Amino acid sequence: VNNINADWAKPLDITIDEDQTRQPYILQKIRIGGARRKLQNIRIAVANIKLDIDSCCMGLNGTVVVRNRADFVSFLEAAYNEGKNTVDYLVFPEFYLPISWIQDVLTFTRKTGITVISGLQYISQNGNAHNVITVFSQIKSGRYNSAVLFAREKNNYAPLEKLLVETECCTVLDNNLPIYMVYDDGGVKFGIFLCYEFTDICARALLKNEVDIIFTPENNSDTTYFSNIIETMSRDLHAFMVQANTSIYGDSRI
């Protein structure tokens, strides 16, 4: 911020409270300052993207990331449509977003106010791989619009995912103290689960009476089993479920 406008700048309006009474879990409650949202007017876009096994393994052992940037830009343009048909939330599947595109998403979110939820491609170093879920949100800084990135690693890895990663000479580890997050975004409260995580019934119970919407990026072939869990969660938690899966397996829905 230049000197002329320095008086307008303020710290980012974020509040994070950590509830450690839910052992063996930690529940973080994050309040994001910004425009008020009305739940009854919320619009959500779910990206329909084909991700095969090779695409999901990008990022392991320094694999060169190859992704169709034109498709990515078209998703962003369709979601915003020059402000004519703006959605509030845009959801991509697990493993979709390359790290090199993070700045592009932050810029998009800052300018449009659209919150983006996506899984990152694997991050690997020294034989350890990390599957990460991200939330990009617009936030106010005085009279300015800014954008912030929230990210956390997957708490529980599926047995098949562990085997798949091992074939690429990497290792993934479950979190001994799982962390889940609830976001208060202008009055709309939402949570996130990354694919296999919501097989944990105790983790699902953490969000009871806490959220209006749950976003679940995933790459999952067992759509029958997971569909039953999704429908059960919606009834038990009285929340909207937003599921973004690879188009190879389908079942992306709200």
Residues of each region from the PLM?
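C-terminal beta-strand edge segments of enzyme domains
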Residues: V1-K29, T232-M233, N245-I254
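Active-site catalytic loop in hydrolytic enzyme cores
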Residues: A9-R37, N128-N209
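N-terminal active-site segment of His-dependent metallophosphoesterases
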Residues: K29-T86
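Active-site-proximal beta-strand elements of phosphoester/diester hydrolases
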Residues: N41-T63, A151-E153, V188-E197, F215-P217
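Active-site-proximal beta-strand/loop segments in catalytic clefts of secreted hydrolases
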Residues: I49, E94-F95, G119-Y122, N155, ...
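Cys-nucleophile CN-hydrolase/nitrilase-fold catalytic domain and related Cys-dependent amidase chemistry
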Residues: A70-F150, N220-D222, R235
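Short, surface-exposed connector motifs at secondary-structure boundaries
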Residues: K84-L90, D184-K189, N209-I214
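CN hydrolase (nitrilase-like) catalytic-core segments centered on the catalytic cysteine
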Residues: D88, I102-I117, F198-I254
